[in-house]
A protein has these predicted regions:
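Phosphate-group recognition and catalysis centered on beta-loop-alpha active-site segments
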Residues: 1-172
C-alpha cells in the first residue's frame, strides 16, 4: 500500500516517489481517480501512457484495448473521444465507488498541473507519419509543462519525430 511520505531518507537526501500509471495496484490505473489518489497522498510525480484515437484525441491508456481494465473487448484505435465514457476502468475494483472513464490528456493535465515530475510514455505507433502526428499533438497539449514533463517512449519513431521537430521537452 502506498502511504504518505514527507521525510527525507537521510539528512540532505530525499526520495521521489513516482506514481506508476497513477497508483497502479492501489487505484484503477491511468484514471483521474488514480491520479487524484496519489495527489491526496502528497505524491507530486507521475508516469502515465498516452495513445491517440481515430479522431486524434490523446488519451491516457496503457493497453491498446479495454479488456484488462474495463472487461470490454474493443480496440481503442477504433474509438473516438465520444465513446470513452462507455468504458469503466474501475469495474474490477469492488471497493472503488466511482466510475472511472478513460481520461483525455488535457483532463489529466488539469488535475496534475502542480506536479513536479510528469513522465509521459508515448506508446508505439505503426508509421513515422503517426509518430509525427501524435508528437505534434502531444507537444501542443504539454505547453506550459516544459519544466515538469518528460516524454518517453520505447518506439524509435517517436524519438525521431521529436528530434526532427527540435522538441524542447526532456526525453527518455
Amino acid at each position: 500500500m502506498i502511504q504518505r511520505y514527507d521525510h527525507p531518507v537521510q539528512s540532505g537526501c530525499s526520495m521521489r516517489i513516482i506514481g506508476h500509471r497513477g497508483a497502479r495496484g492501489e487505484a484503477p490505473e491511468n484514471t483521474l481517480g488514480g491520479f487524484q489518489y496519489i495527489q491526496n497522498l502528497g505524491i507530486r510525480a507521475v508516469e502515465f501512457d498516452v495513445r491517440q484515437l481515430k479522431d486524434d484525441a490523446l488519451i491516457i491508456m496503457h493497453d491498446d484495448d479495454f479488456v484488462r481494465t474495463s472487461g470490454q473487448q474493443k480496440n481503442l484505435y477504433e474509438c473516438s473521444r465520444e465513446e470513452l465514457d462507455a468504458y469503466n476502468h474501475a469495474v474490477n475494483w469492488s471497493e472503488w465507488n466511482k466510475v472511472e472513464a478513460t481520461p483525455l490528456l488535457d483532463q489529466t493535465l488539469s488535475l496534475i498541473q502542480n506536479f513536479e515530475h510528469i513522465e509521459v510514455e508515448v506508446k508505439a505507433v505503426k508509421t513515422q507519419a503517426e509518430a509525427e502526428k501524435i508528437t505534434l499533438a502531444l507537444e501542443q497539449q504539454l505547453k506550459g509543462f516544459e519544466h515538469s514533463a518528460v516524454i518517453t517512449s520505447f518506439d524509435p519513431k517517436i524519438h525521431q519525430a521529436l528530434r526532427s521537430r527540435h522538441s524542447q521537452f526532456k526525453r527518455g
